[in-house]
């Protein structure tokens, strides 16, 4: 399907609720309002309540997180019986891998190498250079053995490589420009700092070839940080965070509610993405917003489109190595999440959107306030310690210890399941997972909530510069 970026933008404007602005139905207003008003009431109870119930905001926070763990536990139960990821038979769909790069010269060659060396390489590799000012052009000249194309033009080597050179306009616009040159049935987005394992593309092909209604799929990623003290600590915490998060995605996939697809390594059916207008340049998390648009369009037209997470499609992706970069990343992620939840608020609680509307998006409505609940609970706990409120600290401490025990149990079980799911291709182990479960509530989790709260500030002030 040949298409221009102008036509993509026209389709985006005609489909996205950011422009169509549907009315917000009463269920959505009630769900979002309940989450916010409940926080106000629970926080007020800290000054009016007695005994352990003065810490009601913390109790609700613990109960909500435990409920999500229980949901994931139940839905991921079948993973204990996974033995392998069977290869599909029959015709294989054609695939273009799109690498978007902005000043990624040090890592770009390794990313391309990993694609070229796949057990089943993509039919085309399209490097979309978003106006890099570093040595990216030199790297690509050496790799493609071609002079740099003019801005807005594409150079093609005699191999599978294509080089699209664009003026700097952001990842989403560069991706949309690349889509106009894709000639295959599928395209896969790969960040320039993401290294795919050898069978990753094959696993993507398997999934799409066996399921004609699969519109998008995410691979399973492992975070890799720099070799510094802060990098090693953050990699430890983020590794187990990623394990839990990808298992959670599997759980939501099981109830047809998966919305979170990692653009660092994701596969899409080209016709579906072009139909809904490509990626939105005005969203901070263009991959996440895209999935909402795909699911909405599919439900509205009874197309049966759905999404998946693939345990056989594995990759390693660069993750923040310093607290500052980590907080900025989480600020962008959460700010973009709030943008998307706001734009698609008419789907919240709407039965016509199936489990996405009835379950997933109401949970996401609660998630908008989860970091605020968490930080409120922690600040109150500090206040009890400073003021010597022993009568509160003892029962609250018991609740926290009980939650840690639950987390320990879930962490151990999740490592067992995750290893089965990815075929043993992981370095995570039980000992470090248990240690992370003990330390995380008083360290890494607080930084996650701080970054998310910063995202709230950015969302409310409509900041787009990151």
Q: Predicted segment positions?
A:
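Membrane-embedded multi-pass helical conduit in multi-pass membrane proteins
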Residues: 42-79, 87-89, 364-460
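Long helical/loop segments within the catalytic core of UDP-sugar-dependent glycosyltransferases
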Residues: 149-163, 167, 172-180, 184, ...
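N-proximal low-complexity "stem/linker" segments adjacent to membrane-targeting elements
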Residues: 3-110
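Cell-envelope/extracellular polymer assembly enzymes that use nucleotide-activated donors
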Residues: 93-96, 124, 274, 289
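Active-site donor/metal-binding and catalytic loop motifs
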Residues: 305-325
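Acidic donor-binding segment of Leloir-type glycosyltransferases
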Residues: 113-167
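Short aromatic/hydrophobic "clamp" motif used to bind/position activated sugar donors
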Residues: 187
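A short, conserved alpha-helix in the catalytic core of glycosyltransferases
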Residues: 272-275, 283-309
């Amino acid at each position: 399907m040949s298409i221009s970026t102008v036509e993509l933008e026209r389709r985006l404007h005609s489909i996205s609720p950011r422009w169509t602005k549907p009315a917000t139905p009463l269920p959505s207003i009630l769900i979002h309002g309940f989450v916010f008003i409940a926080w106000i009431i629970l926080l007020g109870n800290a000054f009016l309540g007695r005994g352990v119930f003065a810490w009601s905001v913390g109790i609700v926070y613990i109960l909500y997180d435990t409920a999500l763990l229980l949901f994931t536990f139940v839905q991921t139960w079948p993973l204990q019986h996974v033995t392998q990821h069977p290869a599909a038979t029959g015709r294989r769909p054609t695939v273009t891998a799109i690498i978007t790069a902005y000043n990624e010269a040090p890592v770009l060659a390794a990313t391309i190498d990993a694609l070229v060396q796949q057990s089943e390489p993509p039919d085309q590799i399209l490097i979309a250079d978003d106006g890099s000012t570093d040595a990216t052009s030199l790297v690509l000249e050496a790799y493609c053995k071609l002079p740099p194309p003019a801005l807005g033009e594409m150079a093609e080597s005699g191999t599978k490589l294509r080089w699209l050179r664009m003026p700097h306009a952001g990842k989403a616009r560069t991706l949309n420009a690349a889509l106009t040159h894709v000639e295959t049935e599928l395209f896969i987005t790969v960040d320039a700092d993401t290294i795919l394992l050898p069978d990753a593309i094959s696993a993507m092909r398997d999934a799409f070839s066996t399921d004609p209604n699969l519109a998008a799929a995410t691979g399973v990623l492992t975070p890799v940080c720099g070799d510094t003290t802060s990098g090693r600590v953050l990699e430890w915490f983020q590794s187990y965070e990623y394990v839990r998060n990808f298992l959670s995605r599997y759980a939501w996939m099981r109830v047809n509610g998966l919305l979170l697809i990692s653009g660092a390594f994701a596969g899409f059916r080209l016709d579906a993405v072009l139909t809904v207008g490509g990626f939105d340049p005005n969203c901070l998390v263009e991959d996440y917003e895209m999935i909402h648009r795909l699911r909405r369009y599919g439900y509205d037209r009874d197309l049966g489109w759905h999404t998946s997470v693939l345990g056989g499609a594995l990759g390693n992706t660069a993750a923040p190595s310093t607290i500052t970069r980590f907080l900025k990343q989480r600020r962008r992620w959460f700010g973009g999440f709030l943008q998307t939840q706001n734009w698609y608020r008419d789907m919240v609680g709407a039965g016509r959107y199936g489990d996405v509307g009835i379950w997933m998006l109401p949970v996401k409505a609660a998630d908008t306030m989860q970091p605020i609940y968490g930080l409120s609970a922690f600040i109150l706990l500090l206040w009890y310690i400073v003021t010597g409120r022993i009568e509160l600290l003892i029962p609250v401490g018991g609740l926290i210890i009980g939650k840690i025990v639950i987390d320990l149990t879930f962490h151990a079980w999740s490592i067992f399941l995750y290893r089965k799911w990815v075929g043993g291709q992981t370095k995570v182990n039980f000992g470090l997972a248990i240690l992370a479960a003990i330390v995380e509530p008083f360290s890494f989790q607080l930084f996650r909530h701080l970054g998310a709260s910063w995202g709230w500030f950015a969302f409310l002030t409509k900041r787009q510069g990151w």
